[in-house]
């Protein structure tokens, strides 16, 4: 096994004495920093490389701190205006994961970069911490490489806002296998519409 494989196994055993100590110390360190800051290199190089990161020019890592818990509806004095069934303010659950929220914040902050992917690096009782891989699409090392040219195209602008990253697709319920039958046809709505539309084909 290579070094990255050993590193992967270390991260799989998060309850081990070494990892529990490391994660506690790192969470303390991350809490002292701002909620969004650039890191010189990835905390988990094995995971970052599996997601497409390369230690060369054009790749940037940002660490994002996201507050845990549900999403309170932003309404003034709890006035939601409407039927009582829609009066909920506090117990509202956000449709997307905190990881996709972290990607969105990184994408907003670095408008000229493209979000490639992200991964978990730690959490405590209040926050979750993610590292987001961003790509500088105007760098020659990215534009001239056939493996990374795809992300330079205009169709991938703010892909994190449209649920096109790995975390975003997971929140949309997309994937392969029997677990994802609810989204056959592109989305939950498309699958529901197809299954609930009565089609009476003309007999010929």
Swiss-Prot record:
Which Pfam families did the record assign? Ribosomal_L15e
Q: Name one GO biological process term.
A: cytoplasmic translation
Question: Where found, per UniProt?
Answer: Cytoplasm
An annotated GO cellular component of this protein is: cytosolic large ribosomal subunit
Keyword field:
Cytoplasm, Ribonucleoprotein, Ribosomal protein
Q: Superkingdom of this entry's organism?
A: Eukaryota
Q: What is an example of a GO molecular function annotated in this UniProt entry?
A: RNA binding
Q: Please give the family membership noted in the entry.
A: Belongs to the eukaryotic ribosomal protein eL15 family.
**What is the protein's known function?**
Component of the large ribosomal subunit. The ribosome is a large ribonucleoprotein complex responsible for the synthesis of proteins in the cell.
Subunit and partners? Component of the large ribosomal subunit.
Its protein name is Large ribosomal subunit protein eL15
Species the sequence originates in: Paramisgurnus dabryanus
